Amino acid sequence: MNYENITIRSMTNTDEAAVCEFFDAMGGESRAFFNRMNTNRKHAVSFCQTPSQKRRYFIAELDGKAVGLVFFLDWNTKIPELGVAVRDEYQGNGIGKRLVRFAVDFAKESDKGGIILTTHIANIRAQALYEELGFSCLGTYKNAKELIYILRYTDAI
């Protein structure tokens, strides 16, 4: 399949059903890594219903199907927090890398100073991607189940 045809666009109030379907399709590992306690789903659906200036959400589509999400929390700060997820059956095809690069470029063009994110300590594939793209691991988060990564634009790809 040609993944070059993926489009990344801002999420709108018409995307609620696609967002719900995206989260419903997540397998156990994806839920554990990305949607523990259903928090990311709740925030994404809430954003569809009532957009906030403190957040930015984007949806990646292929043939009309949501194959990825990328979002920023705390957008009104100099270094917002990034979240990325790829639909299970599309993982391992470079879509996550494309979404992170999109996010890096978008934040940089918006005069942000960098990006911060957390990832589950067992999510080795994501850690490798973030490090490949120039993120530095700062250590474990207070719950010791997540690692904190930062990308300062002086370090960027």
Regions found by a protein language model. Name each.
Residues 6-19:
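A short beta-loop-alpha structural element at the N-terminal edge
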Residues 74-82, 91, 113, 143-145:
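A conserved beta-turn-beta hairpin within the catalytic core of GNAT-like acetyltransferases
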Residues 83-92, 119-120:
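A short, internal acetyl-CoA/4′-phosphopantetheine-binding micro-motif in the GNAT/acyltransferase core
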Residues 92-105, 128-132:
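Conserved acetyl-CoA-binding loop-helix of GNAT-fold acetyltransferases
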